[in-house]
A protein has these predicted regions:
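Non-transmembrane, aqueous-exposed alpha-helical and coiled segments at domain scale
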Residues: 1-391
Length: 393
């Protein structure tokens, strides 16, 4: 039946070019499709030299602030920065001390789930995929909102801040439900401490003993910041544009975006990177043998192994040609954590694949621009070191 449906439902691929139909958010030449305008973030991938645009190291700006400067300032002050960057993205300016204090207090106020929500919604229907679990929880929160359908700016802002506050609990509690009911592990549900940052809340809820190191929390905080915003043209954000244009409610729009984010070509890529490397480790005898690694990467591209999709996950980007600035920042942090946690050999393997993959892709595929590792590449290793490998952050 499936073959009959396929044979009677195919469209000649040449017609897409003939009528200039976009089949996704990327053109045939690999460039991203313009889907809208934003002043929340700015991406720079080219610079003018002698009147011509030439590729350059990528730059990312949040509301006019270079993300390198944002992260650098946070590291210099040895503080957590996720909450203040949320404020920046929402309101367009950096908060002063009083504004940040009030905003953090608001996040803490909303950091609670309805009574019996964990038992009735999260634990009763565990899912092997955390994005599926979170999306279902978000949709169900509609039923606990006294004013769910109001799409005024004030109400949508309130709903979004509440969702930002509870996402750590939705994800970690969903993970615990999966571990308990589908993997026969012990079940434990911790409450979020009001004095903790978002990164600390995630790690505290995740661990049986609630313990984590300052380095773990700071690196996770950095990862959260680097994944927050990227030009407004990605798949899940585009999904939000489409769905909200119908006038639907906040919970439905966010659930739709999460459904998009679940896909392995979008937000699910960091989980795919983790599993791809687990597969590589099983089949590569010598992690320092470039030739053996390159041969196996060719097999991945030729759909002979791993998930047979022909993709080296974590490589390439729709916009960046030379480098992804988020990846550069994250790589340095992951290297520090890998050294502290005893993952030096794993990190070295990631570096080798990062170096060899562009060569293999260039030999096997027709490419229109440079191929470099993106922010998902090292995040897979990071989340596995933090025991977050199955949780989409």
């Amino acid at each position: 039946m499936a073959q009959k449906m396929i044979s009677n439902s195919m469209i000649d691929t040449s017609l897409y070019s003939k009528y200039n139909v976009k089949r996704g958010l990327r053109d045939l030449d690999g460039k991203g499709v313009l889907t809208g305008l934003t002043d929340i973030s700015t991406i720079i991938q080219n610079k003018e030299v002698d009147g011509k645009l030439v590729p350059c190291d990528g730059e990312l700006y949040y509301r006019g602030y270079n993300v390198n400067d944002i992260v650098g300032g946070i590291l210099e002050d040895d503080r957590f920065g996720f909450e203040e960057v949320v404020y920046l993205l929402l309101f367009g300016e950096m908060p002063n001390v009083a504004q940040l204090t009030d905003f953090k207090e608001l996040l803490v106020k909303y950091r609670t789930l309805p009574q019996n929500f964990v038992r009735d919604v999260i634990l009763k229907a565990p899912s092997e995929d955390m994005m599926n679990s979170i999306a279902r929880s978000v949709l169900t929160l509609f039923c606990y909102d006294d004013n769910p359908n109001d799409t005024s700016v004030d109400n949508v802002l309130r709903q979004c801040i509440q969702l930002i506050s509870v996402f750590p609990m939705l994800s970690v509690y969903g993970y615990h439900a999966y571990n308990h009911y589908l993997r026969d592990k012990s079940l434990y549900i911790h409450r979020a401490e009001p004095t903790m940052s978002t990164a600390e809340v995630i790690l505290s809820l995740l661990r049986p003993d609630r313990k984590y190191t300052p380095l773990e929390a700071k690196v996770l905080d950095m990862a959260l910041i680097l994944h927050m915003e990227h030009g407004g043209g990605n798949n899940s954000t585009f999904t939000t544009h489409v769905v909200t244009s119908s006038g639907t409610d906040t919970y439905s729009a966010i659930a739709a975006a999460l459904a998009s984010l679940k896909g392995p070509k979008h937000g699910g890529a960091n989980v795919k990177v983790f599993y791809m490397f687990e597969d590589i480790k099983k089949h590569i005898k010598d992690w320092k043998d470039d030739e053996e690694i390159a041969d196996y990467l060719e097999k991945i591209l030729e759909k002979q192994t791993f998930d047979r999709m022909g993709l080296i996950y974590g490589m390439g980007h729709a916009v960046y040609t030379i480098s992804d600035p988020r990846q550069i920042i994250l790589k340095g942090a992951v290297q520090k954590l890998a050294k502290a946690e005893g993952y030096d050999e794993d990190f070295e393997l990631y570096e080798r694949v990062e170096r060899l993959a562009p060569q293999v892709i260039g030999k096997k595929r027709k490419i229109y621009k440079g191929v470099a590792s993106n922010v998902d590449f090292y995040s897979g290793l990071l989340y596995s070191m933090l025991d977050l490998s199955l949780i989409h952050i």
